[in-house]
Amino acid sequence: MGRTPCCDKIGLKKGPWTPEEDEVLVAHIKKNGHGSWRTLPKLAGLLRCGKSCRLRWTNYLRPDIKRGPFTADEEKLVIQLHAILGNRWAAIAAQLPGRTDNEIKNLWNTHLKKRLLSMGLDPRTHEPLPSYGLAKQAPSSPTTRHMAQWESARVEAEARLSRESMLFSPSFYSGVVKTECDHFLRIWNSEIGEAFRNLAPLDESTITSQSPCSRATSTSSALLKSSTNSWGGKEVTVAIHGSDYSPYSNDLEDDSTDSALQLLLDFPISDDDMSFLEENIDSYSQAPPIGLVSMVSKF
């Protein structure tokens, strides 16, 4: 059940008002007053709807209507009243004598609303606009809020997957390897690398001709220490091998041990057999506890 219509609207005229109709309406209201707008058309002899007569009188034919553009004070007052009353144009028009609600509505939609947008204000709330503009408003219902949450979660998941795929892609590692290669290449081309390049090269023939066994022998022979002592008119050279161990020198140490033992057995026996130990005990005390002692008799 809605509001009952003001008239039957059968055989009534529609469209713009003619000047003759305006004169009839103004003359009737000046003489009798408007009274009830439902019965006015029949009393005035107009083929118009009661609502149409009311709007025509209120918005155009009223004698106290102020004509012409709105002043700056009137526009400022409209903006202030709209912030309080919203789109209640009739209530706003009641605060501006001589201005109709239709005029104020047209003024707002054509000028004042655009002015607020250019100033960065929301025309509905008169608050500063968000940084992302009017297109992205805050969700107003639980459904829209949930949709916004799902959308943000989806965007975050896609960003995380794209980062992981970039880490596992071959192009990413090739870029890392290339960076490391460039790093070592820069070191090689620097002053440090130049110092290494200026080193004198080793003789390849010497390196290739030496076997592992010969290199071990030469190393151990470099560690030998010799001392000469006189035992009863004979010079004896005592060679002390270092304690460095080499897997290639085991056979050499066994041979030298056998030869040293044979020399001790062949050593001539004299009356003072212990003089050798008494005279050379200091030189034996200086020798390392581990090592091989070989004695070679020189005549």
Swiss-Prot record:
Keywords: DNA-binding, Flowering, Nucleus, Repeat, Transcription, Transcription regulation
Gene3D superfamilies, A to Z: Homeodomain-like
Location relative to the cell: Nucleus
InterPro entries: Homeodomain-like_sf, Myb_dom, Myb_TF_plants, SANT/Myb
Signal peptide stretch: none
DNA-binding region coordinates: 37-61, 89-112
A GO term from the CC aspect: nucleus
GO biological process: flower development; regulation of flower development
Residue stretches making up the HTH myb-type domain: 9-61, 62-116
PROSITE patterns cross-referenced by the UniProt entry: HTH_MYB
Annotated tissue distribution: Expressed in the shoot apex, young flower buds, developing carpels and siliques. Expressed in floral meristem, initiating floral primordia and developing flowers.
Recorded phenotype for the gene knockout or disruption: Meristem identity phenotype; increased number of cauline leaves and secondary inflorescences.
Coarse class of the protein's main subcellular location: nucleus
Keyword Zinc-finger appears in the UniProt entry: no
MF terms (GO), sorted A to Z: DNA binding; DNA-binding transcription factor activity
Electron transport found in the keyword field: no
Subunit: Interacts with LFY.
Function recorded in the entry: Transcription factor that may play a role in flower development by repressing ANT. Regulates the transition of meristem identity from vegetative growth to flowering. Acts downstream of LFY and upstream of AP1. Directly activates AP1 to promote floral fate. Together with LFY and AP1 may constitute a regulatory network that contributes to an abrupt and robust meristem identity transition.
Protein name stated in the entry: Transcription factor MYB17
Naturally occurring in which organism (per UniProt): Arabidopsis thaliana
Gene coding for it: MYB17
